[in-house]
Amino acid sequence: MTKAREQATADELANRIFFRLYQCANMLHKTGTRALDDYGITTQQWAVLGALSRDDAENGPNDGGPNDGGLSVGDLARVLMVSRQNLTGVLARLEKRGLVEKSVDPGDARSRRVQLSHEGRNLWHEALLPKIFGYYEEALEGFSINERVSTLNDFNRLLENFKVLDLDGSGDATETEGN
Protein backbone atom coordinates (compact mmCIF):
# COMPACT_ATOMS: atom_id res chain seq x y z
CA MET A 1 0.00 0.00 0.00
CA THR A 2 1.38 3.40 -0.95
CA LYS A 3 1.80 6.14 1.63
CA ALA A 4 -0.97 8.20 0.00
CA ARG A 5 -3.35 5.22 -0.09
CA GLU A 6 -2.53 4.39 3.53
CA GLN A 7 -3.35 7.97 4.56
CA ALA A 8 -6.61 7.91 2.60
CA THR A 9 -7.57 4.67 4.37
CA ALA A 10 -6.69 6.16 7.78
CA ASP A 11 -8.73 9.28 6.98
CA GLU A 12 -11.75 7.23 5.88
CA LEU A 13 -11.56 5.07 9.02
CA ALA A 14 -11.33 8.18 11.22
CA ASN A 15 -14.37 9.63 9.46
CA ARG A 16 -16.33 6.42 10.02
CA ILE A 17 -15.30 6.20 13.69
CA PHE A 18 -16.35 9.77 14.46
CA PHE A 19 -19.59 9.52 12.51
CA ARG A 20 -20.44 6.30 14.36
CA LEU A 21 -19.57 7.98 17.68
CA TYR A 22 -21.91 10.84 16.76
CA GLN A 23 -24.68 8.36 15.91
CA CYS A 24 -24.13 6.45 19.16
CA ALA A 25 -24.30 9.67 21.20
CA ASN A 26 -27.59 10.58 19.53
CA MET A 27 -29.01 7.10 20.09
CA LEU A 28 -27.89 7.14 23.73
CA HIS A 29 -29.76 10.40 24.22
CA LYS A 30 -32.88 9.15 22.42
CA THR A 31 -33.09 5.63 23.83
CA GLY A 32 -31.72 6.53 27.27
CA THR A 33 -34.34 9.21 27.74
CA ARG A 34 -37.01 6.77 26.55
CA ALA A 35 -35.77 4.15 29.06
CA LEU A 36 -36.42 6.57 31.93
CA ASP A 37 -39.47 8.25 30.43
CA ASP A 38 -41.76 6.81 33.12
CA TYR A 39 -39.83 8.94 35.61
CA GLY A 40 -39.50 12.04 33.42
CA ILE A 41 -35.70 11.84 33.55
CA THR A 42 -33.55 12.86 30.57
CA THR A 43 -30.07 11.53 29.85
CA GLN A 44 -28.59 14.82 31.08
CA GLN A 45 -30.50 14.53 34.36
CA TRP A 46 -29.50 10.85 34.57
CA ALA A 47 -25.82 11.84 34.30
CA VAL A 48 -26.18 14.48 37.03
CA LEU A 49 -28.03 12.14 39.40
CA GLY A 50 -25.48 9.42 38.71
CA ALA A 51 -22.53 11.71 39.42
CA LEU A 52 -24.15 12.91 42.64
CA SER A 53 -24.84 9.31 43.73
CA ARG A 54 -21.15 8.38 43.70
CA ASP A 55 -19.59 7.77 47.11
CA ASP A 56 -17.25 10.75 46.82
CA ALA A 57 -20.20 13.05 46.09
CA GLU A 58 -22.55 11.51 48.65
CA ASN A 59 -20.12 11.50 51.53
CA GLY A 60 -17.22 13.79 50.72
CA PRO A 61 -14.07 13.20 52.70
CA ASN A 62 -16.07 12.67 55.94
CA ASP A 63 -13.62 14.81 57.84
CA GLY A 64 -16.21 17.20 59.26
CA GLY A 65 -14.93 19.88 56.92
CA PRO A 66 -16.89 22.09 54.57
CA ASN A 67 -16.90 19.57 51.73
CA ASP A 68 -18.77 16.74 53.43
CA GLY A 69 -21.61 15.79 51.10
CA GLY A 70 -22.31 17.01 47.60
CA LEU A 71 -20.13 18.60 44.98
CA SER A 72 -19.53 22.18 44.06
CA VAL A 73 -21.30 23.15 40.84
CA GLY A 74 -17.87 23.68 39.25
CA ASP A 75 -16.65 20.23 40.28
CA LEU A 76 -19.85 18.65 39.01
CA ALA A 77 -19.43 20.46 35.67
CA ARG A 78 -15.85 19.15 35.43
CA VAL A 79 -16.89 15.57 36.24
CA LEU A 80 -19.62 15.71 33.57
CA MET A 81 -17.43 17.70 31.15
CA VAL A 82 -20.13 20.30 30.53
CA SER A 83 -20.21 24.05 31.00
CA ARG A 84 -21.62 25.52 34.19
CA GLN A 85 -24.16 27.32 32.03
CA ASN A 86 -25.47 24.04 30.58
CA LEU A 87 -25.51 22.46 34.03
CA THR A 88 -27.45 25.33 35.63
CA GLY A 89 -30.69 24.57 33.76
CA VAL A 90 -30.50 20.84 34.44
CA LEU A 91 -29.88 21.47 38.15
CA ALA A 92 -32.76 23.96 38.33
CA ARG A 93 -35.18 21.39 36.90
CA LEU A 94 -33.93 18.67 39.27
CA GLU A 95 -34.13 21.05 42.23
CA LYS A 96 -37.68 22.06 41.28
CA ARG A 97 -38.64 18.36 41.31
CA GLY A 98 -37.05 17.98 44.74
CA LEU A 99 -34.38 15.53 43.53
CA VAL A 100 -31.35 17.67 44.39
CA GLU A 101 -30.60 20.32 46.98
CA LYS A 102 -28.27 23.27 46.65
CA SER A 103 -26.54 24.99 49.51
CA VAL A 104 -23.89 27.63 50.06
CA ASP A 105 -20.44 26.07 50.28
CA PRO A 106 -19.25 26.72 53.85
CA GLY A 107 -15.69 26.90 52.55
CA ASP A 108 -16.50 29.53 49.91
CA ALA A 109 -19.67 31.62 50.21
CA ARG A 110 -19.48 32.45 46.48
CA SER A 111 -19.76 28.78 45.57
CA ARG A 112 -22.79 26.48 45.65
CA ARG A 113 -22.78 22.80 46.50
CA VAL A 114 -25.32 20.37 45.14
CA GLN A 115 -26.29 16.96 46.46
CA LEU A 116 -29.05 14.41 46.09
CA SER A 117 -32.07 15.07 48.25
CA HIS A 118 -33.58 12.20 50.23
CA GLU A 119 -36.20 11.84 47.48
CA GLY A 120 -33.52 11.95 44.76
CA ARG A 121 -31.43 9.31 46.51
CA ASN A 122 -34.45 7.01 46.87
CA LEU A 123 -35.49 7.50 43.24
CA TRP A 124 -31.94 6.82 42.05
CA HIS A 125 -31.35 3.66 44.05
CA GLU A 126 -34.82 2.12 44.06
CA ALA A 127 -36.22 3.00 40.64
CA LEU A 128 -33.66 4.40 38.23
CA LEU A 129 -30.67 2.11 38.79
CA PRO A 130 -32.58 -1.10 38.03
CA LYS A 131 -33.92 0.47 34.81
CA ILE A 132 -30.48 1.82 33.89
CA PHE A 133 -28.76 -1.54 34.42
CA GLY A 134 -31.44 -3.19 32.27
CA TYR A 135 -30.84 -0.56 29.59
CA TYR A 136 -27.07 -1.19 29.75
CA GLU A 137 -27.61 -4.92 29.28
CA GLU A 138 -29.78 -4.35 26.22
CA ALA A 139 -27.39 -1.81 24.70
CA LEU A 140 -24.37 -4.07 25.31
CA GLU A 141 -26.12 -7.24 24.09
CA GLY A 142 -23.57 -9.56 22.50
CA PHE A 143 -20.54 -7.87 24.10
CA SER A 144 -18.44 -10.26 26.17
CA ILE A 145 -16.80 -9.04 29.39
CA ASN A 146 -13.49 -8.80 27.50
CA GLU A 147 -15.11 -6.77 24.73
CA ARG A 148 -16.67 -4.44 27.30
CA VAL A 149 -13.27 -3.93 28.95
CA SER A 150 -11.65 -3.32 25.56
CA THR A 151 -14.36 -0.84 24.55
CA LEU A 152 -13.98 1.02 27.84
CA ASN A 153 -10.21 1.17 27.36
CA ASP A 154 -10.65 2.50 23.81
CA PHE A 155 -13.08 5.17 25.02
CA ASN A 156 -10.70 6.14 27.83
CA ARG A 157 -7.87 6.60 25.31
CA LEU A 158 -10.13 8.64 23.03
CA LEU A 159 -11.27 10.77 25.97
CA GLU A 160 -7.65 11.47 26.95
CA ASN A 161 -6.97 12.64 23.38
CA PHE A 162 -10.05 14.88 23.48
CA LYS A 163 -8.87 16.39 26.76
CA VAL A 164 -5.56 17.33 25.14
CA LEU A 165 -7.53 19.07 22.38
CA ASP A 166 -9.63 20.86 25.02
CA LEU A 167 -6.88 22.32 27.18
CA ASP A 168 -8.06 25.71 28.39
CA GLY A 169 -4.64 27.29 28.09
CA SER A 170 -3.64 26.57 31.68
CA GLY A 171 -2.59 23.03 30.84
CA ASP A 172 -5.34 21.73 33.12
CA ALA A 173 -7.48 19.06 31.48
CA THR A 174 -10.62 17.66 33.08
CA GLU A 175 -10.25 14.62 35.35
CA THR A 176 -12.08 11.40 34.53
CA GLU A 177 -10.56 8.91 36.93
CA GLY A 178 -13.00 6.29 38.13
CA ASN A 179 -15.45 6.69 35.26
Please tell me what each predicted stretch does.
Residues 1-9, 59-67, 145-179:
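C-terminal regulatory/oligomerization modules of transcriptional regulators
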Residues 1-39, 97-99, 146, 179:
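N-terminal leader segment of winged-helix/HTH proteins
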Residues 3-5, 92-150:
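Charged, amphipathic alpha-helical coiled-coil/dimerization segments
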Residues 19, 47-51, 88-90:
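Base-recognition residues in the alpha-helical recognition helix of bacterial helix-turn-helix
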Residues 24, 28-31, 80, 123-142, ...:
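Alpha-helical linker/hinge and terminal dimerization helices associated
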Residues 26-83:
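N-terminal helix-turn-helix DNA-binding core of bacterial DNA-binding proteins
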Residues 59-114:
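Canonical helix-turn-helix DNA-binding module
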